[in-house]
């Protein structure tokens, strides 16, 4: 989930990486973020509740898994299998986005949705439920061989077990249109900076 001026777990730079697991003070919609458990795996994929039983997620989640249930705020809801609707762009091309309805209605959590693209240099808060990160930094050479801190040109975090809903902050560094193999969309990029502060974040695998 993305909100301006405000997506699954995100990776944060601060501490041991386990922080920010409850709603931020200036909450842009924590209660609207849920997840789908992918079949035959122990992983989940992020969904956002829009209201009136409608959810949105990446189309590739539906393509690979055809999920039957969604979990939101601790409760599980069955998906109406006839409600899946793929989103198209104004040009008529398919986007990597799909909406669906649940059979029963979740609580009504108000959600504000932007009517325009997020501009460059805008501050964003990301909420997601993707993979966790390792406690300590790992280091790589310029050829991406694993090394130690003394020989490292690049540093970052490798994946850890499990996933956790988490939030973080970043700044939009650029925008572009792209095809991810499942549809065309307008997107934006953020950079995971070492000096970005304890809430500096980047989206993780399964943050779809």
Where are these regions (language model features)?
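Conserved catalytic-core segment of clan PA serine endopeptidases
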Residues: 12-24, 67-166, 173-177
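N-terminal compositionally biased, intrinsically disordered segments and leader/signal-like regions
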Residues: 42, 89, 148, 191-192, ...
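Protease-domain processing segments flanking chymotrypsin-fold serine proteases, especially trypsin-like
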Residues: 1-56, 65-72
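Extracellular trypsin-like serine protease catalytic domains
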Residues: 164-208
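Glycine-centered structural positions embedded in regular secondary structure
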Residues: 45-47, 128, 168
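Short hydrophobic-aromatic micro-motifs
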Residues: 50, 55-58, 100, 127
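Short, acidic/hydrophobic/Gly-rich beta-strand patch recurrent on exposed beta strands
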Residues: 34-37, 98-101, 191
